[in-house]
């Protein structure tokens, strides 16, 4: 861990996504797609993951579960522009930020 690690953006309510097994997500850095994924490609479904985790830990509203990342992860540089898109069934959710120098 280091200062500024694991920043979290605005939340999407779980009820906003109708089918969690059909969600696509993408991360662009400086306009180039660096990561892209689809929840249908997960080894275990989100429901299975939460069920398994809840056998060992108490899950509460607002808890964050982190499972890893698709290929393409790499170091960020000062002033990099980041854009994250979560494609839901009825709308897309988009977050943008930049890496402070």
Language-model features: where?
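Catalytic-pocket segment enriched in acidic/His residues
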Residues: 1-101
């Amino acid at each position: 861990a280091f200062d500024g690690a694991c920043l979290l953006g605005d939340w999407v309510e779980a009820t906003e996504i109708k089918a969690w097994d059909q969600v696509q997500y993408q991360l662009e850095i400086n306009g180039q797609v660096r990561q892209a994924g689809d929840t249908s490609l997960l080894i275990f479904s989100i429901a299975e993951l939460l069920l398994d985790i809840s056998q060992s830990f108490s899950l509460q509203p607002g808890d964050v579960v982190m499972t890893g990342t698709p290929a393409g992860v790499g170091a960020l540089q000062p002033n990099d522009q980041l854009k994250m898109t979560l494609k839901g069934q009825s709308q897309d959710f988009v977050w943008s930020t930049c890496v402070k120098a």
